[in-house]
């Protein structure tokens, strides 16, 4: 077992260990295909893709576990709470980009404040759209036939 775990890049001062999980070709391929690391995407499209996925799944906990879960308004309150969290997250992303990066020219657009602003804008648009899409599916009871866990 000791032969499988080595310092990352054979440098013990990096602070990371190279294990069979984090250095395998499958893991590296998977991480390179995530939208945040995928080459050729603008920050707006990266944010849009990330936002759609997050907006779609973020409505569920508010809908099923929120304080109005046993009322007729549970789905609507879940949508409103999800949109509120999405707005707060987008504002936090914009603030992070402003305080972390400057507006100097960089080959990677995500390493600039303007790139992070575009990422946050795409995230906001995609997440609200994803939450709205999930709301439409749940409101029309389209998921109840395929997933019995939602019928409670």
From Swiss-Prot:
Its main location: plastid. One of its GO terms (cellular component) is photosystem I reaction center. Keywords: Chloroplast, Membrane, Photosynthesis, Photosystem I, Plastid, Thylakoid, Transmembrane, Transmembrane helix. Residues 94-123 are lumenal. It is found in: Plastid, Chloroplast thylakoid membrane. GO terms for biological process: photosynthesis. Residues 1-72, 145-152 are stromal. The chain crosses the membrane at residues 73-93, 124-144. It is a multi-pass membrane protein. Gene3D superfamilies: Photosystem I PsaL, reaction centre subunit XI (1.20.1240.10). The keyword Chloroplast applies. Pfam families: PsaL (PF02605). It comes from the Eukaryota. PANTHER family: PHOTOSYSTEM I REACTION CENTER SUBUNIT XI, CHLOROPLASTIC (PTHR34803:SF2). Belongs to the PsaL family. This is Photosystem I reaction center subunit XI. The gene is psaL.
């Amino acid at each position: 077992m000791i032969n499988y775990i080595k310092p990352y890049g054979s440098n013990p001062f990096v602070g990371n260990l190279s294990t069979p999980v984090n250095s395998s070709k499958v893991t590296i391929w998977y991480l390179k295909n995530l939208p945040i690391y995928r080459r050729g995407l603008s920050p707006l499209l990266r944010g849009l893709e990330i936002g759609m996925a997050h907006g779609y799944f973020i409505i569920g906990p508010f809908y099923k576990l929120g304080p109005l879960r046993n009322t007729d308004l549970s789905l609507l309150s879940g949508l409103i709470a999800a949109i509120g969290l999405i707005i707060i997250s987008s504002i936090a992303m914009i603030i992070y980009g402003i305080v972390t990066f400057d507006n100097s020219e960089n080959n990677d657009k995500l390493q600039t404040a303007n790139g992070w602003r575009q990422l946050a804008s795409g995230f906001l648009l995609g997440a609200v759209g994803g939450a709205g899409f999930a709301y439409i599916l749940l409101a029309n009871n389209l998921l109840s036939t395929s997933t019995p866990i939602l019928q409670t």
